[in-house]
Structure formats: structure tokens, C-alpha cells
């Protein structure tokens, strides 16, 4: 079944979707579209969770800041503990739960840990989609990206500018650039991503649930749903 602007009100089985893509590939935008198309779907973003931890200056947040400022991916153990705890707290481990994961897992070790956790609850991932976007496009997006930190709303000065320059459309509060939204840091992040993404893609291809779509389209194919 092909997702379009209409809502998908019925699926043959609970959808547990992993959205893959390099930093800046548009995973947040795709997530927003999917949540509108599938009302019963919920989402969790590792990036949003981390930013919340950093803002609260928790122990985990301070530890994560060190890695992010250097353009490095977080260690498997650190991010895995955070995400699996949140999945459990939200009650999303039961077989009937429907959700979308953005930004996790990023390594085969994280993927294996997630599979094992879901297996313990008689559940599993059943669709993995990668957003394919040229690196030049990503870097251009990042240079023009601003965010409203409290809500997570993202703006781009070229194709999604705020109504009032520098201010959030809803609250009127100031927009900021993320700590890692610089070309220098992002190039490092893209290299780190490439190193871990190929093994991760191979991991999910073996399970038969992997697919790729252009990150510049809104089309995601839902097979057998």
C-alpha cells in the first residue's frame, strides 16, 4: 500500500517502523507526514530525547554533550539504555503497539539489542525504510536550519521559513541553531554515519523488511499492510 495525503485508518497488523537516514536527511519531516497519514501511529526520536536530556543537564545529557560537540555518535550502551527505557516506560513493547523509531538503532549492536528486547515481548520490527539524500543537499539544509528547542519544531530559511524571521510561528519565542548544525561538525557526523549504516542496512536486508526511498519525496511504500 502506498502512503499519500489521505489517512490510513486500517492496517492488517501493528506497524513497527524504523526510519533510517543520514543526519539532515529529513527524518523529522517524514515522521510528521506519517503521523498524519496513520493516526494510530506514535513516534520516538532519539535526537529529541537527547536534546531533552541535555537541556535538563542530567547525567546522561552531560555525557552526551561531549560526543555531540565533537560530531561523534553516542556509544551503543549509552543510547541503547536511553531508548529501551523510554520504550518500556511508554508501554510500546507489547505486540499490539504501533510506533516509528527515528535515529535508533544506528549500529548492528544496537539493532541486535532492540531485536532481543522486542523478542522478549513477542514483538518485532516489521519495516525498515532508508531516506536517500545527496550529501550536498544535506549540508545545504543544515546551513539554513533553525529550531524551536522546547517544541522541536524545525524551520529552514529556504523552503520552510518562519513567518517572522528568527521567531517560532506558534509561540513567538526565539529560534536557535543546534550545537551540531555546522558544516564542519556535520561532515564528521556524515562520515561516522556511513561507517555504521552499511552494516546496519545489511543486517536488516537479511530479514527482508528493508527498503529505500528518496528523502526528497513523501512516498513511503507499506508492503503487506
From Swiss-Prot:
Domain of life: Eukaryota
GO molecular function term, any single one: nucleoside triphosphate adenylate kinase activity
EC numbers: 2.7.4.10
Cellular location(s): Mitochondrion matrix
Reported induction: Expression level is low on glucose or other fermentable carbon sources. Induced about 3-fold on glycerol, and significantly induced by ethanol.
Residues annotated for GTP binding in this entry: 24-29, 145, 154-155, 218
Xref: Pfam families: ADK, ADK_lid
Keywords: GTP-binding, Kinase, Mitochondrion, Nucleotide-binding, Transferase
Single biological process term from Gene Ontology: ITP metabolic process
Keyword Ion transport: no
Region (LID): 144-181
InterPro entries per UniProt: Adenyl_kin_sub (IPR006259), Adenylat/UMP-CMP_kin (IPR000850), Adenylat_kinase_CS (IPR033690), Adenylate_kinase_lid-dom (IPR007862), AK3/Ak4_mitochondrial (IPR028586), P-loop_NTPase (IPR027417)
Renumbered residue ranges of the record's region NMP: 45-74
GO cellular component terms, A-Z: cytoplasm; mitochondrial inner membrane; mitochondrial matrix; mitochondrion
Disulphide bridges: none
Misc: Present with 704 molecules/cell in log phase SD medium. Depending on the yeast strain, the GTP:AMP phosphotransferase is encoded by ADK2 with or without a single base pair deletion/insertion near the 3' end of the open reading frame, resulting in a long or a short form. The ADK2 short form (this entry) is also referred to as PAK3, while the long form has been named AKY3. A sequence of the long form can be found in strain D273-10B (AC E9P974). The modified C-terminus in the long form contributes to protein folding and is critical for protein stability.
Subunit-structure text: Monomer.
Domain statement: Consists of three domains, a large central CORE domain and two small peripheral domains, NMPbind and LID, which undergo movements during catalysis. The LID domain closes over the site of phosphoryl transfer upon GTP binding. Assembling and dissambling the active center during each catalytic cycle provides an effective means to prevent GTP hydrolysis.
Protein name (Swiss-Prot/TrEMBL): GTP:AMP phosphotransferase, mitochondrial
Species assigned in the record: Saccharomyces cerevisiae (strain ATCC 204508 / S288c)
